[in-house]
Amino acid sequence: MADTTGRIPLWLIGTVTGIAVIGLIGVFFYGSYSGLGSSL
């Protein structure tokens, strides 16, 4: 796993993935609290 992707840094991928996961969890809990998540 020592080979880097070259164009895209690994920390950038981790940061974007983390923000996306946190955003999806936030939207899911917000929908659950507002009653929109009950249909999922």
Swiss-Prot record:
One of its GO terms (cellular component) is plastid. It is a single-pass membrane protein. It is found in: Plastid, Chloroplast thylakoid membrane. The chain crosses the membrane at residues 8-28. Its main location: plastid. GO terms for biological process: photosynthesis. InterPro entries: PSII_PsbJ (IPR002682), PSII_PsbJ_sf (IPR037267). The keyword Transmembrane helix applies. It holds the Pfam family PsbJ. It comes from the Eukaryota. Keywords: Chloroplast, Membrane, Photosynthesis, Photosystem II, Plastid, Reaction center, Thylakoid, Transmembrane, Transmembrane helix. One of the components of the core complex of photosystem II (PSII). PSII is a light-driven water:plastoquinone oxidoreductase that uses light energy to abstract electrons from H(2)O, generating O(2) and a proton gradient subsequently used for ATP formation. It consists of a core antenna complex that captures photons, and an electron transfer chain that converts photonic excitation into a charge separation. PSII is composed of 1 copy each of membrane proteins PsbA, PsbB, PsbC, PsbD, PsbE, PsbF, PsbH, PsbI, PsbJ, PsbK, PsbL, PsbM, PsbT, PsbX, PsbY, PsbZ, Psb30/Ycf12, at least 3 peripheral proteins of the oxygen-evolving complex and a large number of cofactors. It forms dimeric complexes. Belongs to the PsbJ family. HAMAP family: PSII_PsbJ (MF_01305). This is Photosystem II reaction center protein J. It comes from Oryza sativa subsp. japonica.
